[in-house]
Amino acid sequence: MKTKNSKEQLTPDNMESQSLEVSMLNKDNFSDKELESYLSKGEIKATDKITIPPKILFVGDCTIATFGNFSASTGKAKSKKTFNISAMVAAAVTNTTVLNYRADLPEGKRKILYFDTEQSKFHCHNVLERIYKLSGLSLQKDDCRLLFWGLREYTPKLRIALIDYALRKHDEVGLVIIDGLRDLMYDINNGKEATDVMTVLMAWTSVYELHIHTAVSYTHLRAHETKANL
């Protein structure tokens, strides 16, 4: 698989169909060689020099996002979660303060990928316009620091594959938005599916050294928590 540091430009013709992180979800058996490789990769030694992950988003003096982690906006349906995310993204695009959010993405990690899994193209475009207006960007020119996709018409499995592909294709990504996390699953009450999606999120944040922010409704959170407590 071509890595993010490869000099050759990644295209659909020279890329593998999925990353190692996603392909692992479909495997039940691992060879000793694979297990040794994964175990070695995960080993942490006292002599390792591990730097503090960059803090990239703040509300006042409180850090709300760092590289290598993911977070979520939660609330009832139609509770302005998307507006909250719009303000966050607007701050991140310009590395300034927008409403209550302040952003400080490092150079070389300024690109933002936004995936909406629920809304129509019309409503997705409204969200994108709102971000541009909040950040003071001109609507007459596309800003290459922010890429936006609507994935409403695709299956959960294809949505995961498309996000995975975008992460492998685009360099210098510091922030990923997934508005509609539950749409990466067929059944929100399926414990294995929920664990698999969380595992992929953790892998993406670690492998690509970025932050993922998602939107989740209380209804979906309660459904999964009820299932987990049975």
Residue ranges and their predicted role:
Residues 176-179, 211-216:
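Short beta-strand segments at enzyme active-site cores
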Residues 1-31:
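Short, small/acidic-rich helices and loops at N termini and domain boundaries
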Residues 219-228:
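Conserved small/polar residues in nucleotide/adenosyl-binding loops
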Residues 23-130:
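The Walker A/P-loop phosphate-binding site
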Residues 196-214:
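Substrate-engagement module of ASCE P-loop NTPases
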Residues 64, 166-167, 204:
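A general structural signal for stabilizing positions within well-ordered secondary structure
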Residues 106-192, 196:
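Conserved inter-motif catalytic segment of the P-loop NTP-binding fold
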